[in-house]
UniProtKB/Swiss-Prot annotation:
Family statement: Belongs to the NrdI family.
Molecular function terms, GO-annotated: FMN binding
InterPro entries linked to this entry: Flavoprotein-like_sf, RNR_NrdI
Record's protein name: Putative NrdI-like protein
PANTHER family tied to this protein: PROTEIN NRDI
Listed Gene3D superfamilies: 3.40.50.360
Organism of provenance: Streptococcus pyogenes serotype M3 (strain ATCC BAA-595 / MGAS315)
Pfam families in alphabetical order: Flavodoxin_NdrI
GO biological process: protein modification process
Membrane-spanning intervals of the chain: none
């Protein structure tokens, strides 16, 4: 059974709810085993992630509008520290952001910042707890990212 790891942080429960539903969907529809790592449970510990993973990050920013102020991440920095440690960023297939669209420019801004900072793609986004459509859409995106990564690992150089 193929495996994918989801590395995330959940503070209010929205992201945890999404990850649980996404994990069930991946297991039921793609026969994937999903390993979940909730950074909140680690209490600032880091360790090397040996397998490919997808990061999922809610948006928590200081006040402002996300354009000329309010771009500084708060509360979720342990996820960034975890990704930065032990070369974990190199095994990250990409990031999925969550947020509240009422915050306009700040919506998923932290995930966009992580994508730029670490050089991996922003795979998608969902609002609040996410909808069933978000689950199926992002599961497909994860499967495609995992498949691309697996293809790159198995390619061999032609004989010289």
């Amino acid at each position: 059974m193929p495996q994918i790891t989801l590395v995330f942080i959940s503070l209010s429960g929205n992201t945890l709810s999404f990850v649980k539903r996404l994990s069930l969907y991946l297991a039921d529809n793609y026969d994937y085993h999903v390993k979940q790592i909730n950074i909140k449970d680690l209490k600032h510990e880091t360790f090397p992630v040996k397998e490919e993973f997808v990061a999922i990050l809610p948006t928590y920013l200081e006040g402002g509008n996300g354009v000329d102020s309010g771009e500084a991440e708060i509360l979720t920095t342990p996820l960034g520290e975890f990704i930065a440690a032990h070369g974990n960023a190199q095994r990250c297939l990409g990031i999925i952001g969550s947020g509240n669209k009422n915050f306009n420019h700040q919506y998923c801004l932290t995930a966009k910042q992580y994508a730029k900072r670490f050089g991996f793609p922003l795979l998608g986004d969902f609002e609040l707890r996410g909808t069933p459509d978000d689950i199926s859409r992002l599961a497909q995106v994860i499967m495609e990212a995992s498949s691309r990564h697996s293809s790159n690992d198995t390619q061999t150089l032609p004989n010289s």
